[in-house]
From Swiss-Prot:
SUPFAM superfamilies: GroEL apical domain-like, GroEL equatorial domain-like, GroEL-intermediate domain like. The gene is groEL. Its EC number is 5.6.1.7. InterPro entries: Chaperonin_Cpn60_CS (IPR018370), Cpn60/GroEL (IPR001844), Cpn60/GroEL/TCP-1 (IPR002423), GroEL-like_apical_dom_sf (IPR027409), GROEL-like_equatorial_sf (IPR027413), TCP-1-like_intermed_sf (IPR027410). This is Chaperonin GroEL.
Length: 546
């Protein structure tokens, strides 16, 4: 086991705080509409230029191991805030630095760190209550666009495209961000339910121009096993043929004789059919087949429930207004399912989302909700170069997370004003001991820091602006983009309540843990012996020119 180095009390804290400051100072230059970019070196390819706090934080690794502890703790604040709220990483970093710096002064003056932490927790709880009181719900498309614009570093085109996407697929809909092919941002909307399985044979195509099999007013047969024997399918095919309507077959697989017969009937025009594989795998496949059945008003024909394919009737088949089957995906538009059943299914999946522990499961469940609820929007980000594309894509993703957070918990005045107004609630608090009062006082100073940083980045005098804003009321604040004092909500300078709340809670949590640390242990670097010198070259090779 490698030897360790241990530092205690102030020796440990001073070194750790140095690391906190290095990371926080790099991250906080990006805060606000006039924040600067940070250039990140890459081992391969072009460097990345970003104004995203968490991207900067993730790149920082310090040589001094004690300093690195501080940097990693603040990095954790940024990552947690990004995971929970999707934005607010820079604000969280700025708050964490302020709490640590103020807290250390008190610890050095002999205050009890545990009581300081209790005071900090009391003050943060009061600030959160105040933020929730000040929060107002986001209802209009204009407000969504404003939130998106602020999060995308005051880029109104990004805010607008996100608002348009939410208009089209609803606030619960899935919105994905992809690389575009042009210089402009574009929005594509897939209405209805789409899953990533295409036709099993190109002979099913009936629209050569689009290379799709388009079925109007079709029946949908959903089966959870393989179909290889045409005899199992014949009874249901005969019933469908009598109705003169097309048929989509969704099964684990359709192969051999069954597939050949379907293709021949399709080419001859006897029965218009298309077959696709069921989406997903294992339990997820079962759940998705059930979703399709509910959406189309059909039933999953499964031997597990005592049903068999040869006994299937038209009553068990789903229906839709239109289905398009391409090479790699199938889109079901306007399924004939009962609205109440779909709603109940969505409710059931939402309950599963609440209980999901992994991000992957949560994402897949969210996708299922969106497909049942009405569609998927794809924002294609346009840019001139790959470096710009990466930077812009990160901003669009940030803005998307921020707007979702705003829809979830509402918005408060941006520009650091909401935290500043929470000072009134904190100032009225009384701790059980003088040390707890010091913790409360510490947060009173720390909540000013986001506004101070925004103003400093805009090239103005922070103390003057903070005093002016404190003398105002409600949403009155400083708009760093225009350099004016105004009603920030009217100007569209908004922050999602969830983002501001999460930033404060995470910053206080990690910073107060750091203040209560009394020792730090790191591994000592091993002194490795130098590698032996390379042997000399072969004799008699002189005079050769290399």
């Amino acid at each position: 086991m490698a030897a360790k180095q241990v530092l205690f009390a102030d020796d440990a804290r001073v070194r750790i705080v140095r690391g906190v400051n290095v990371l926080a100072n790099a991250v906080k230059t990006t805060l606000g509409p006039k924040g600067r970019n940070v250039v990140l070196e890459r081992s391969f390819g072009a460097p990345t230029v970003t104004k995203d706090g968490v991207s900067v934080a993730k790149e920082i690794e310090l040589k001094d191991k004690f300093e690195n502890i501080g940097a990693q703790l603040v990095k954790d604040v940024a990552s947690k805030t990004s995971d929970n709220a999707g934005d607010g990483t820079t604000t969280a970093t700025v708050l964490a630095q302020a709490i640590v710096q103020e807290g250390l002064k008190y610890v050095a003056a002999g205050f009890n760190p545990i009581d300081l932490k209790r005071g900090i927790d009391k003050a943060v709880a009061a600030a959160v209550v105040e933020l929730k009181k000040a929060s107002k719900p986001v209802t209009t498309s204009k407000e969504i666009a404003q939130v998106g614009s602020i999060s995308a570093n005051s880029d109104s085109s990004i805010g607008q495209i996100i608002a348009d996407a939410m208009d089209k697929v609803g606030k619960e809909g899935v919105i994905t961000v992809e690389d575009g092919k042009s210089l402009e941002n574009e929005l594509d909307v897939v209405e209805g339910m789409q899953f990533d399985r295409g036709y099993l044979s190109p002979y099913f195509i009936n629209n050569p121009e689009k290379q799709v099999a388009a079925l109007d007013d079709p029946f949908v047969l959903i089966y959870d096993k393989k179909i290889s024997n045409i005899r199992d399918l014949l009874p249901v095919l005969e019933q469908v043929a009598k109705s003169s309507r097309p048929l989509l077959i969704i099964a684990e697989d359709v192969e051999g004789e069954a597939l050949a017969t379907l293709v021949v009937n399709n080419i001859r025009g006897i029965l218009k059919t298309t077959a696709v594989k069921a989406p997903g795998f294992g339990d997820r496949r079962k759940a998705m087949l059930e979703d399709i059945a509910i959406l189309t008003g059909g039933t999953v024909i499964s031997e597990e429930t005592g049903m068999s394919l040869e006994k299937a009737t038209l009553q068990e088949l789903g229906q839709a207004k239109r289905i398009e089957v391409a090479k790699e995906n199938t889109t079901i538009i306007d399924g004939a399912g009962d609205g109440k059943s779909i709603e109940a299914r969505v409710k059931q999946i939402r309950a599963q989302i609440e209980e999901a522990t992994s991000d992957y499961d949560r994402e897949k469940l969210q996708e299922r909700v969106a497909k049942l609820a009405g569609g998927v929007a794809v924002i294609r980000v346009g840019a001139a170069t790959e470096v710009e594309m990466k930077e812009k894509k990160a901003r669009v993703e940030d803005a998307l997370h921020a707007t979702r957070a705003a829809v979830e918990e509402g918005v408060v005045a941006g520009g650091g004003v909401a935290l500043l107004r929470a000072k009134q609630a904190i100032a009225g608090l009384q701790g059980d001991t003088p040390d707890q009062n010091a913790g409360i006082k510490l947060i009173l100073r720390a909540v000013e820091e986001p506004l101070r940083t925004i103003v400093t980045n805009a090239g103005e005098e922070a103390s003057v602006v903070v005093n002016n804003v404190l003398n105002g009321k409600g949403n009155y604040g400083y708009n760093a983009a225009t350099g004016e004092y105004t009603d920030l909500v009217e100007q569209g300078v908004l922050d999602p309540t969830k983002v501001t709340r999460t930033a404060l809670q995470n910053a206080a949590s990690v910073a107060s843990l750091l203040l209560t640390a009394e020792a730090a242990v790191v591994e000592l670097a091993e002194d490795k012996p130098a590698a032996p010198a390379m042997p000399g070259g072969m004799g008699g090779m002189g005079g050769m020119d290399f």
